[in-house]
Amino acid sequence: MHNQHTMYESFHKFSLSYWQLLLIAVTSDGRILATGSYDTTVMVWAVSRVRGSEKRVKTTQAELPRKDYVIVETPFHILCGHDDIITCLFVSVELDVVISGSKDGTCVFHTLREGRYVRSLRHPSGSALSKLVASRHGRIVLYSDDDLSLHLYSINGKHIATSESNGRLNCVQLSGCGEFLACAGDQGQIIVRSMNSLEVVKRYNGIGKIITSLTVTPEECFLAGTKDGSLLVYSIENPQLQKASLPRNLKSKVSATG
């Protein structure tokens, strides 16, 4: 997370105003950055670490070394295929794929290495795509605020399942193992679904507040931020989901900050 943030800061300084970017996605190894822009294109950039002396970041307790990142000023791919702005983006070295979703209701696949067009998916009702996630197992989920539904596909474009989200989703995150999808939004709950069928595996009740951000920790805990500034921490109580040893009954509101 820190590496991605640092890369974005460096990238932001020299390119954001020029390219008018909407969003970014970074590969798991941090070496490739994909960006979506208002002009309906996706650009793919190489990332490298700055060599030489390390900068140091001051904290309240100590100084920590920080490595900066350099994004090559010219993208090595400019990918086309959409008729409207890019709304969601995924890039993976392991799958050799760049997947982009758009307000035009399409999801377009390109190869990462060659930048070659592979296929397009269209939302079942043509709705603008709001979010997409893809697992390393080759499963893709599309979500639209217009129909409030999740749509599961294989990497080859085969439709597998559809399920209503039962409310507007602000966050969709994969578990570390890639087999489960955590969804949260206006209802204030975290709902965990199978990436094989979209079946609900577990439901975590919140505190009646809209959840605006969600992350899954390496220990497979959920950290959820609410609209009023609260931070909620959940352990994964289902043995099927739990991939690491966690303290029991860790299910509490940790802080409330504005």
Give names to the regions the model predicted:
Residues 30, 95, 138, 178, ...:
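Conserved loop/turn motif of beta-propeller repeat scaffolds
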Residues 19-26, 84-91, 126-134, 167-174, ...:
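Canonical WD40 repeat/beta-propeller blade segments in eukaryotic WD-repeat proteins
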Residues 51-67, 74, 203, 208-212, ...:
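Terminal intrinsically disordered, low-complexity extensions flanking WD-repeat/beta-propeller proteins
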Residues 50, 73, 115, 157-158, ...:
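Short coil/turn linkers that define WD40 beta-propeller blade boundaries
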Residues 4, 10-16, 54-59, 66-70, ...:
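Short C-terminal beta-strands that terminate individual repeats in beta-propeller domains
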Residues 1-2, 42-47, 107-112, 150-154, ...:
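WD40-repeat beta-propellers
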Residues 36-39, 101-104, 144-147, 184-187, ...:
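Conserved strand-to-loop turn within each blade of WD40 beta-propeller repeats
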